[in-house]
Amino acid sequence: MHPNAANSLLKVIEEPQSEVYIFFLTSDEEKMLPTIRSRTQIFHFKKQEEKLILLLEQMGLVKKKATLLAKFSQSRAEAEKLANQASFWTLVDESERLLTWLVAKKKESYLQVAKLANLADDKEKQDQVLRILEVLCGQDLLQVRVRVILQDLLEARKMWQANVSFQNAMEYLVLKEI
């Protein structure tokens, strides 16, 4: 958001003209400016994962894939779109392999990053890989090793969002883990 737009928005929030209610809807509250977040009341709406899992199973996905996709997706439309997308499931398979190797501290993890970087050739796919890894880590938080990987993964995501190349951010993650 441009600074002038943010300032105008803050003025509207702080000095409403009349009985006005303003709603901001976002899939990631961290992307909202801190000054705006500090002047709002935040409500979290939970996804209806169980219903989405049932829908995805009815579409023909096995339970494991349906569960992963329900946790990954931010909407029913996104889940339905990705359910039949072969490229998405390739990213899932390769991300699972990377995480398995990271947990086992295998040096081959470094080679897997190159494979993922080739598959994730645009920002959208790169974001998908990072989100897939976050979901996979979230499924096994009881392991201390997985929690450490998740922390480093979040750091790698911040680097990527700060315009470090995807491959460099992922290589950083691997170097921290092996």
Positions of PLM-derived features:
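Conserved catalytic/switch belt of AAA+ P-loop NTPases
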Residues: 7-23
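Charged, glycine-rich active-site and insertion segments that engage polyanionic ligands
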Residues: 18-21, 26-132, 136-178
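Short, surface-exposed loop and linker segments with low hydrophobicity and enrichment for Pro/Ser/Thr
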Residues: 1, 10-14, 120, 127
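Conserved AAA+/SF3 P-loop NTPase catalytic/coupling segment centered on the Walker-B
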Residues: 1-10, 31-33
